[in-house]
Amino acid sequence: MAVRIRLKRMGAKNNPFYRIVVADSRTPRDGKTIDEIGYYNPLKNPADIKVDVEKAKKWLSYGAQPTDTVKILLKKAGVIE
């Protein structure tokens, strides 16, 4: 099972925010998730990023691969270098 850390879109039409979740790579974008580790709201100025650092490091140590966008967000949150 290939596990990814990725964004799950939430919110209303034209008003999105995203949850940073751990999911199997074969599930749909908004499908079933394994764990939720934070959220990202791009509409606030500056963008609102909240990550549970302990959970994120745990899943990265288990071998979960972040998507390109999530990797940038984790760097901004100080989880990875």
From Swiss-Prot:
GO biological process: translation
Record's keyword terms, sorted: Ribonucleoprotein, Ribosomal protein
GO molecular function, one term: structural constituent of ribosome
Pfam families with a match to the protein in the record: Ribosomal_S16
Listed transmembrane segments: none
GO cellular component term of the entry, any: cytoplasm
InterPro entries: Ribosomal_bS16, Ribosomal_bS16_CS, Ribosomal_bS16_dom_sf
Family matches, as HAMAP family: Ribosomal_bS16
Similarity remark: Belongs to the bacterial ribosomal protein bS16 family.
Name assigned to this protein: Small ribosomal subunit protein bS16
Organism from which the protein derives: Caldicellulosiruptor bescii (strain ATCC BAA-1888 / DSM 6725 / KCTC 15123 / Z-1320) (Anaerocellum thermophilum)
Classification of source organism: Bacteria, Bacillati, Bacillota, Bacillota incertae sedis, Caldicellulosiruptorales
